[in-house]
Amino acid sequence: MPDLSFLLYALAAVAGCLALPVLAWYVVTALWGLAPLRGGVGRPTEKRLRFAVIVCARHEEAVIGQLLDSLKAQDYPQDSYQMFVIADNCTKDDTAGAARAHGATVYERHDEKKVGKGYALEWALARIREDYPDRFDAVCVFDADNLAAPDFLSRMNEALQNGADVAEGYRETINPGETWVSGCYALYWMFLMRFFYRARRNLGMSCMVCGTGFAFKMEVLGPEGWHTRTVTEDCEFSIQQITAGRTIAFVSEAVFYDEQPRDFATSLHQRFRWLVGAAQATYWCMKTVIRGIRAGHRGSVDMLGFVLAGPAAVLLLLQGCFFWRRRCCGPRRRSQFCAG
C-alpha cells in the first residue's frame, strides 16, 4: 500500500508546480508598472466618433444626477454623444425620473429573473441599436456613482481613433478618506492601475475593462450584440475581445472618479460576487482562451493567466495549509497541537 504521506507531499508539490507559473507571470509583468509610462492615446484627431453613453442604474436616484451633470460638462461636441440611463428593476426609488430631469434618455427594464449589469447591457444595447440604427460609432459605459473628467470622451475618442478597439480609463476614488474600507479600496485601485494596467501599457499588451469607465467601438459587438453569462461581465467581455485578437488600451489620460463601499458588509458582498464571477470565468471562458491561443493571439496567454489565477490561489492556499499542518502536527508535536 502506498505511503499516504508520500502521496500527500506529491500532491502538494504538483499543486505548487501548477500554481507558481501563474504567480510568476503576474510578478514579472507587474515590474513594468515601475517604469515610466510609455506611449500615448494617439494623435489628436478632428474626427469625432458618435458615442452612446450608457449608465446602468438600480436605485441610484440620489447620485445619478451628479454623473449626468459631469457628462453634460464634457468638452466633447454635444451633438456627438447621447446619454442613456437603464433604470434596471428600480422599485424603491425614482431613478428614471431623476435621470430624465438631468437630460438623459431613459429605458426602464423590469426583469426579476435576469438580474445584473450584464443582462441590462445586453437588453439596452439591443434596444439602442434597434431605435437608433447606424447612429452611434462607439459606446461608453459608466456606473451611476461615477464622475467623469471634462476631457474623458475626448481622450476615449483619440484612443479609439488610433488603433484601440476597446479603451479603459483611469479610476480615481471619490471617497478615499471616508472610512477605512473606502481607504483600502483606494489603495487597491491605485496599485491595480499601476501594476496591472500601466504595466500592460508599457509592455504593449491589452488590459482588461474593470466594470465602468470604458468605451468600445460598436463594431466589436457584431450582429449578436453584447452577450455575457457571468456576474463579472467586464472580465468576460475582456476575454472575448482579447482572444478574438482585438486591442484593449489603457488610457490613463481619461480619468473618472468612482465611489467606493463605506462599510465592511458591503465590501464583503462585493468581493464574494467577484469571487463567484472569477470561478464562472474559469469555467465558461477556458475554451475561449484556448481557441485564442491556438489562433495565435498573444494576449490570450495573459487571459490564460487570468482564468487560472483563482485556481492557482486555491492550490497555493491548500499547499500552505498542508505543510503548516505537517509542521505543527508531526509525530513529535502531535500531542501539543492536535490533541483531541
PLM regions: where:
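Short, acidic, metal-binding catalytic loop of nucleotide-sugar glycosyltransferases
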Residues: 69-80
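A conserved acidic beta->alpha catalytic loop
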Residues: 87-96, 111-113, 147
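Cell-envelope/extracellular polymer assembly enzymes that use nucleotide-activated donors
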Residues: 49-52, 82, 236
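Acidic helix N-cap motif at the loop->helix transition within catalytic regions
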Residues: 65, 91-100, 150-151
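Membrane-embedded multi-pass helical conduit in multi-pass membrane proteins
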Residues: 32, 43-45, 305-340
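N-terminal membrane-anchoring/stem segments of glycan-assembly enzymes
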Residues: 1-47
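Long helical/loop segments within the catalytic core of UDP-sugar-dependent glycosyltransferases
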Residues: 30, 108-110, 114-132, 151-230, ...
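Acidic donor-binding/catalytic loop of UDP-sugar-dependent glycosyltransferases
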Residues: 93-94, 142-159
